[in-house]
Amino acid sequence: MTKYAQTEALVVGGTGAIGLAIAKRLVEGGATVLLTAGTAEDRAHAAAELGSSARVLDPTGFEDALAARDGDGVDLLFAGSVPVARPLLGHLRDGGALVLTSPTPCPGTVRALAAELAGRGIRVNAVAPGCIEAPGSGAAPLPPLGRLGAAEEVARAALFLATEATFTTGARLPVDGGLGTP
């Protein structure tokens, strides 16, 4: 499958369930992926899961790795929060997309950053995951849909916002099984 061929993406904190699911879908679609992982064990696990289409980096040195690469940046940036993403915006190509993936992205912050980057043609959106199955996540109340979500479901929503929702910016998409429904 080459849905994301010629696409370069950076997934910050990519060894959590959601980040790894995003990276896997990107790699399966033909993208070149840079991924950060905090520990040597996490880096080894991610490298084994993703194969040679992904480069797994230590968070302390990945900005140097980005600067040393051929090319002028990445097309897609996935990060948990604005403070994590902001220092990396210089590595995001004009016309690219930033998707925030933390459970509680503030809608006003997403809209403000979207307005700030609109002049570069960069779209900024967020997914807001609810109760997601993950190792060690413990018991959680079930949402109205009656089950916990899967990291893969959040990854699909994030990739939709990054690649297919080309006229959408400043949006926050709940992926919570109805928990946020009034």
For each feature predicted by the language model, list its residue ranges.
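C-terminal substrate-recognition "lid" of short-chain dehydrogenase/reductases
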Residues: 72, 147-175, 180
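N-terminal Rossmann-fold NAD(P) dinucleotide-binding loop
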Residues: 19-20
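Conserved SDR Rossmann-fold cofactor-binding beta-strand/turn motif
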Residues: 123-133, 162, 174-176
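Alpha-helical segment proximal to the catalytic Tyr-Lys
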Residues: 90, 115-116
